[in-house]
């Protein structure tokens, strides 16, 4: 650990930046108050902003994602004249999107099925979003990041526990009644890890990681450690900056040391990528870093900021409890939209933003703003009518919630400050792509007896056909291609299969690699990891009532891994995702494939322009503090202006601020 920086102007300025960033990250406000408690009071306890002595203002909110909707709701309830402009003509919610049946579209064969294109899990330590879900009466149930025992836990009839937040001030905020009978299901680890042609269950890897690790040519102590332990051990020296180990548990240092410790973490490590940190600071071998990247799904993000991965270690790990919204995450923005029907204007894309900045000597010629006029003018074009003339909107001030990656294509007059322009131009937005496949039966939950029973329902001998197929012990085996299968087994168990001729043609060129038969997965929720292009897969945590099937997140990939999928047509994605799913689960899963799926590339989304803001090295200290700084009457909010990138909680924190 390094000490306070030497006393010169450059290091003093950098140290002050790091202190400000630490206080923002920890939500430490003026007078060392906990801002999270203030946000919970505003958003949940009262649902209203504090009293204002300003005259009623006209406010434009740009973007009807979660930030724009909540900001609009609070401002409307406070008596302001609010208009929310959204480019998407068909929906609100931004990167909260659920594939589901509507009156215009049905993505899956079973109209009851749904799956998430975007946000899918809400961690226990994000109290703002969880309490908002409860306040809106949407309900919540557990999302199983690790598969569980189906007959364990307290069951759906027992109420979920209340949302609780313990502040660094010692105060505890809670929302709702205790649920003393609530019990989490037992974690099992039946899902798979497959890398370098070796496949084991997650529980077996945790107990004995050598088989998988040897495939990465690890030796010595590294070969005997699960990758999650390698990373956690590597991060212990960083945690020492702001916490101590007391009786085997991490405890924050006294307040001033805690805040300054985080500031030192930012100062010392913002210049690292995650790969650089593991190699140059933690001393992991290149082989160990490759294993970490593959099994923790971070290979494609090793070049990005250390800080993002460091914070994510708390966000996505097996020990955290997660929640989901029954019926889909779309219900959250939809519930907010219900109270803003008159304020939201869909189908209007902002192309020009003019604003009056009182700190400047004069306004540019030809603008419609000024000291005696409106503070902001926005020009939009209609998404559903390219021939329509642009429309002009005026207001006293604007709150811009769209991603900087989208704002980059808006003409802004006058030019904003240099640091703001840097933030808009340079903020790195990563890619994320999902490929979801629908199956008529929940084969991932099957035992081997279930497999026998269900396959024999299709036709006598189908179970034996798969069981006795050619095996590949060391060398790739070629099962009959889809075109050669006598029974046409792709989708064989599905009435009115949606498998298209295009899918069959693509599949006919892709023989299955590896054994045709795999052990029954018998996994309830959770997910598997692989080094094939699918990377991470997730099984549904809960059945859809009245449905025998489900939708599997067959591929969830980021960054360069996602870009490979983005080059394919949808039909190609479905067939490749199915083949790679079969590599882990055996060929026989094909009989339940309905031929229907859904896929989403956030990098190719014309409104999102990327999955989320994820900094590269140095970006946080270079311009993050300028990301949310107002430019005259123009304010900025969204997950990209928080330090909880890619999470709904971050979007809620900055809008409330």
Swiss-Prot record:
Cofactor: FAD
Family of this protein: Belongs to the flavin monoamine oxidase family. LGOX subfamily.
Transcription among keywords: no
Reaction it catalyzes: L-glutamate + O2 + H2O = H2O2 + 2-oxoglutarate + NH4(+)
Annotated signal sequence range: 1-12
Gene Ontology MF term list: L-glutamate oxidase activity; nucleotide binding
Sites marked Important for substrate specificity: 301
Locations listed in the record: Secreted
GO biological process, one term: amino acid catabolic process
Protein name (record): L-glutamate oxidase precursor
Thermal properties of activity per the entry: Optimum temperature is 40 degrees Celsius for both recombinant LGox and proteinase K-treated recombinant LGox.
Note: The recombinant LGox was digested to three fragments (alpha, beta and gamma) by proteinase K.
pH dependence: Optimum pH is 7.5 for recombinant LGox. Optimum pH is 7-8.5 for proteinase K-treated recombinant LGox.
Gene3D superfamilies: 1.10.10.1620, 1.10.10.1790, 3.30.1490.470, 3.30.70.2100, 6.10.140.1210, 6.10.250.1500, FAD/NAD(P)-binding domain, Guanine Nucleotide Dissociation Inhibitor, domain 1
One matching Pfam family: Amino_oxidase
Gene: lgoX
GO CC term, one of those recorded: extracellular region
Activity regulation text: Proteinase K-treated enzyme exhibits improved affinity for the substrate, increased activity and increased thermostability.
Broad class of the protein's primary localization: secreted
Annotated keywords: FAD, Flavoprotein, Nucleotide-binding, Oxidoreductase, Secreted, Signal, Zymogen
Transmembrane feature ranges: none
Subunit-level organization: The mature enzyme is a heterohexamer composed of 2 alpha chains, 2 beta chains and 2 gamma chains (alpha2beta2gamma2).
UniProt-listed Enzyme Commission number(s): 1.4.3.11
């Amino acid at each position: 650990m390094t000490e306070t920086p030497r006393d010169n102007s450059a290091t003093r300025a950098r140290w002050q930046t790091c202190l400000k960033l630490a206080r923002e990250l920890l939500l430490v406000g003026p007078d060392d108050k906990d801002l999270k408690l203030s946000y919970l009071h505003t958003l949940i306890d009262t649902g209203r902003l504090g009293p204002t002595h300003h005259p009623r203002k006209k406010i434009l909110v740009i973007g009807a994602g979660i930030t724009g909707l909540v900001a609009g709701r609070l401002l409307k309830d406070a008596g302001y004249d609010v208009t929310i402009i959204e480019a998407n003509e068909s929906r609100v919610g931004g990167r909260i999107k659920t594939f589901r049946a509507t009156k215009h579209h049905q993505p899956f064969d079973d109209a009851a099925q749904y799956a998430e294109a975007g946000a899918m899990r809400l961690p226990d330590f994000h109290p703002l979003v969880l309490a908002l879900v409860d306040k809106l009466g949407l309900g919540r149930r557990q999302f199983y990041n690790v598969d569980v025992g189906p007959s364990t836990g307290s069951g759906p009839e027992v109420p979920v526990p209340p949302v609780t937040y313990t502040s660094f001030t010692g105060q505890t905020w809670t929302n709702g009644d205790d649920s003393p009978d609530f019990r989490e299901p037992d974690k099992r680890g039946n899902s798979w890890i497959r890398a370098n042609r070796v496949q084991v269950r997650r529980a077996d890897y945790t107990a004995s990681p050598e088989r998988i690790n040897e495939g990465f040519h690890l030796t010595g102590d590294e070969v005997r450690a699960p990758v999650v332990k390698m990373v956690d051990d590597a991060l212990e020296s960083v945690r020492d900056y702001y916490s101590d180990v007391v009786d085997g548990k991490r405890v924050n240092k006294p307040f001033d040391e805690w805040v300054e410790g985080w500031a030192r973490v930012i100062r010392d490590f913002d210049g690292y990528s995650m790969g650089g940190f593991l190699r140059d600071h933690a001393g992991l071998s290149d082989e160990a870093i490759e294993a970490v990247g593959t099994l923790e799904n971070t290979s494609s993000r090793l070049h990005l900021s250390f800080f993002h991965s460091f914070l994510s270690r708390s966000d996505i790990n097996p020990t955290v409890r997660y929640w989901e919204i029954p019926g889909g995450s779309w219900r959250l923005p939809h519930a907010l939209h219900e109270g803003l029907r008159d304020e939201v204007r869909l189908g209007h894309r902002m192309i020009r933003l003019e604003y009056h900045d009182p700190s400047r000597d004069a306004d540019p010629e030809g603008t419609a703003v000024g000291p005696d006029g409106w503070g902001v003018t926005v020009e939009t074009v209609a998404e559903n009518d390219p021939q329509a003339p642009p429309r002009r909107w005026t207001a006293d001030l604007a709150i811009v919630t769209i991603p900087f990656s989208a704002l980059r294509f808006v003409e802004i007059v006058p030019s904003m400050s240099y640091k703001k322009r840097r933030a808009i131009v340079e903020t790195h937005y990563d890619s994320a792509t999902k490929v979801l496949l629908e199956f008529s039966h929940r084969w991932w939950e099957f035992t081997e007896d279930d497999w026998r029973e269900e396959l024999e329902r299709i036709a006598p001998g189908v179970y034996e056909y798969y069981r006795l197929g050619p095996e590949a012990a060391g060398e790739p085996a070629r099962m009959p291609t889809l075109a050669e299968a006598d029974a046409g087994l792709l989708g064989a168990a599905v009435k009115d299969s949606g498998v298209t001729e295009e899918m069959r043609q693509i599949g006919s060129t892709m023989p299955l690699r590896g054994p045709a038969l795999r052990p029954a997965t018998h996994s309830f929720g959770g997910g598997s990891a692989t080094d094939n292009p699918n990377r991470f897969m997730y099984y549904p945590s809960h059945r859809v009532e009245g449905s025998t099937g489900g939708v599997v997140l067959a591929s969830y990939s980021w960054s360069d891994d996602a870009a490979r999928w983005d080059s394919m047509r949808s039909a190609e994605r479905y067939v490749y995702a199915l083949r790679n799913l079969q590599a882990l689960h055996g060929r026989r899963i094909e009989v339940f494939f309905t031929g229907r799926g859904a896929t989403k590339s956030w990098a190719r989304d014309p409104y999102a322009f990327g999955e989320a803001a994820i900094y590269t090295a140095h970006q946080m200290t270079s311009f993050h503090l300028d990301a949310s700084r107002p430019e005259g009457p123009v304010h900025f909010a969204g997950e990209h202006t928080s330090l909880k990138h890619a999470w709904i909680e971050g979007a809620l924190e900055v809008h409330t601020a």
